[in-house]
């Protein structure tokens, strides 16, 4: 959006005073507003809850100089964290399908609700398809093996039980056993074989591949020969086809050369005829001397005009570097000037305009960008930087402690 808009704007259809000391932007596309009045430094820091929320929340400036709302990077002049005393509506709706930016900044010091904590390092297994998925039925082997089961919970006698999903009250039972009774074989998904384990298994238990060692007379020479023979045959046929094509091409080229020779001979004869006719006409022309003088004067006059025109064209030539397609409304085109807008042709009028424009360009400076004014904002305390200890993979630099190092 252009920040150098004049006061009167066609889309607004209303006059607004243009104050160069203010940055004026479009809010909803229809009215101006002033973002500098968004924060009054003399007011309390949090907005008055009884007022309508400010439509001109903090705006940042993009690479292209456009203003856009930075909801995700808050105003650095505001307090860094949200107001801890702000009222939280317990019944507020949270969209479970809302998009979560995986690259969003996570504050390491953010408060974690102990009743709503999900461990990001929870144990994940890999399925047959290589996808990671939470293994609720085969829990982290480093944890207690079974989750706590309430013995007094109501058991539905008709409920479907998955034979692979073993829930046992016996916490010492093996997986796949209920109260030490062998159950059905556990599913493949209950455990995973790592590639290292697979490799070790291969090394320990696999047998070497049997290699058939042939005697020399057992090799199928005839098969090999016939296999290559088919190749040679196909190449041979393709080469003969190519040769035929080339022969045809040479023949047609020779024909073409002959016809060209014939035509050039005919043209030579025609040229001689024309020259003869021209000489005959010249002898008939310019009977009197005055005609020649008149024609000479006319030629001189034309030459002068050509020189003058060529000088003008040289000074104008830079305008024709890139022919551009003019965008114009035919209703507003001056009919006398119409040729300027068609095909980029040069009329006397357009040439006159170009020379005028050049003189104007010589006598004026280019448009300067407007000055930008910034209103000062009060600075608030920013979080103190944390310096990490540098990693030094080296000897200790301050002498040797005791006799633990000998040169």
Curated annotation (Swiss-Prot):
It is found in: Cell membrane. Its main location: membrane. The keyword Transit peptide does not apply. Sequence repeats lie at residues 40-45, 75-80, 83-87, 89-93, 95-99, 101-105, 107-111, 119-123, 140-145, 150-154, 156-160, 170-174. Residues 40-174 are annotated as: 12 X 5 AA repeats of D-P-N-Q-A-Y. It is a peripheral membrane protein. Residues 7-25 have a biased composition (Polar residues). Disulfide bonds: none annotated. Residues 1-50 are annotated as: Disordered. One of its GO terms (cellular component) is plasma membrane. Keywords: Cell membrane, Membrane, Repeat. The penta/hexapeptides repeats form a proline-rich acidic domain. In addition, a part of this region contains a perfect direct repeat. This is Proline-rich P65 protein.
